[in-house]
């Protein structure tokens, strides 16, 4: 679980996302409150529930990017789901309970990696001994039985060589665990849980089987470390820790929640809209979900919902769900200045990406300040005239601008291209000015 302060979280998000200070502050405080709650006494900890967030803003302003970056910072079970993929229980489609099942699977993977990392030193020692046994087998008598031999000095010499990497390419024969059976089970939509249980059953069938393989020492070391670490980890303890991590630190990011709002003119059962909201309600307010790893309580899972709300409004959500999303954050539409900053300031910005890609062919790209400004203006103008898709427009504009250079790069090794206002106007001018062209091409 992350122990970063809200200021540190915002600073980290600033490295990748331009603007949207309110949204960054809201998610930073929510993430820090997870840590604060864990410092409380048992009784008070049970009473403190997370304050779920609703992020409202046009497409392409950073809602989903905040979720992606938050997942890396959280160091906790995190899952991002599209609200449009679900339908009401009893109809064809995914049920909302699968969100918690998937979140638990994420937690199992996260905890297993952490536990195996703790056991790495012991696993390395055990793997080393098994490789030395394969390199220096005990002699056999006339009846084929192994005899103990005093080869401690030779073993130490080989151990030294093994650690120095001198034996990496030597081939040895080892008994390794057989790979689990890869069985793909097709089930009707909405029956994913049955498929998971059947897959688990087939995987368990070949779990304890061993298989002799000829393998190089370097690859054997990696395989044996994983095998030994997995053997040292207690599966029951792992499940308990994973479920505790989900219940106390789990975060669910619900994207496109505006697409499940009921539209005024529709009538009859709305199974993929209002029906989904009704099914989401128990999860958000707290219930118990049955997963293959055990029962999971959702009372303290943090839900962050986001939507563009261009057609619907937040008030179109059912009142009970509105009440469960108390923190509202509005993200603002991007300006020309924002586009200019997006092109240059974030880590691995778009301009840096294109420079690095072309450098692989020996082509040098230089973006001037006025060229970047003109690019930002071009993206903003097209957004204003056609559909406003936010920062995603920059990808389209940049790809169109770099099309000729990208195509000829392999023949232009050693050359330098300067992207200035004139270059941008020459390659994008007509497209920007002609509304019909920009509507279909940009």
UniProtKB/Swiss-Prot annotation:
Please name the GO terms that the record assigns under molecular function.
Answer: ATP binding; ATP hydrolysis activity; peptidase activity; proteasome-activating activity
Keywords, ordered alphabetically:
ATP-binding, Chaperone, Cytoplasm, Nucleotide-binding
| Annotated localization | Cytoplasm
Provide the GO biological process annotations. Answer: protein unfolding; proteolysis involved in protein catabolic process
The domain of life for this entry's organism is Bacteria
Protein name per UniProt: ATP-dependent protease ATPase subunit HslU
Primary site of residence: cytoplasm
Function recorded in the entry: ATPase subunit of a proteasome-like degradation complex; this subunit has chaperone activity. The binding of ATP and its subsequent hydrolysis by HslU are essential for unfolding of protein substrates subsequently hydrolyzed by HslV. HslU recognizes the N-terminal part of its protein substrates and unfolds these before they are guided to HslV for hydrolysis.
InterPro entries named in the record? AAA+_ATPase, ATP-dep_Clp_protease_ClpX, ATPase_AAA_core, Clp_ATPase_C, HslU, P-loop_NTPase
GO cellular component assignments? HslUV protease complex
Per the similarity annotation, which family is this?
A: Belongs to the ClpX chaperone family. HslU subfamily.
Give me the gene this protein comes from: hslU
């Amino acid at each position: 679980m992350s122990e970063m302060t809200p200021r540190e979280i915002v600073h980290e998000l600033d490295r990748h996302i331009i603007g949207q200070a309110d949204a960054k502050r809201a998610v930073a405080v929510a993430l820090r409150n997870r840590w604060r709650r864990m410092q409380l006494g048992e009784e008070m900890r049970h009473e403190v529930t997370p304050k779920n967030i609703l992020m409202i803003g046009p497409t392409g302003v950073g809602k989903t990017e905040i979720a992606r970056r938050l997942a890396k910072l959280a160091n906790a079970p995190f899952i991002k789901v599209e609200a449009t993929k679900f339908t009401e229980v009893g109809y064809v489609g995914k049920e909302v309970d699968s969100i918690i099942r998937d979140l638990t699977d994420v937690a199992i993977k996260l905890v297993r990696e952490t536990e195996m990392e703790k056991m790495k030193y012991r696993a390395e020692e055990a793997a080393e001994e098994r490789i030395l046994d394969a390199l220096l087998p005990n002699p056999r008598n006339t009846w084929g039985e192994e005899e103990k031999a005093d080869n401690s000095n030779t073993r130490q010499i080989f151990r030294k060589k093994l650690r120095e990497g001198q034996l990496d390419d030597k081939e040895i024969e080892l008994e390794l665990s057989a790979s689990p059976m890869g069985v793909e089970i097709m089930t009707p939509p909405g029956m994913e849980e049955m498929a998971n249980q059947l897959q688990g059953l087939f995987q368990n069938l070949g779990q304890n089987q061993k298989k002799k393989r000829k393998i190089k020492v370097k690859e054997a070391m990696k395989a044996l470390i994983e095998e030994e670490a997995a053997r040292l980890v207690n599966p029951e303890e792992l499940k308990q820790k994973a479920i505790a991590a989900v219940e106390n630190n789990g975060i669910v990011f619900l994207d496109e929640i505006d697409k499940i709002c009921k539209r005024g003119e529709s009538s009859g059962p709305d199974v993929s809209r209002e029906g989904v909201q009704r099914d989401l309600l128990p999860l958000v307010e707290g219930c118990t979900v049955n997963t293959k790893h055990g029962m999971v309580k959702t009372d303290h899972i943090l839900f962050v919902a986001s939507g563009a709300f261009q057609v619907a409004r937040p008030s179109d959500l059912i009142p009970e769900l509105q009440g469960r999303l108390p923190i509202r954050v509005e993200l603002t539409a991007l300006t020309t200045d924002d586009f200019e900053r997006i092109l240059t300031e974030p880590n691995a910005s778009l301009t840096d990406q294109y420079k690095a890609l072309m450098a692989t062919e020996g082509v040098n790209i230089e973006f001037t300040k006025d060229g970047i400004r003109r690019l930002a203006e071009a993206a903003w103008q097209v957004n204003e005239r056609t559909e406003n898709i936010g920062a995603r427009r920059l990808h389209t504009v940049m790809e169109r601008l770099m099309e000729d250079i990208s195509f000829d790069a392999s023949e232009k090794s050693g050359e330098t291209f300067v992207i200035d206002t004139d270059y941008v106007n020459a390659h994008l001018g007509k497209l920007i000015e002609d509304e019909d062209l920009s509507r279909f091409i940009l």
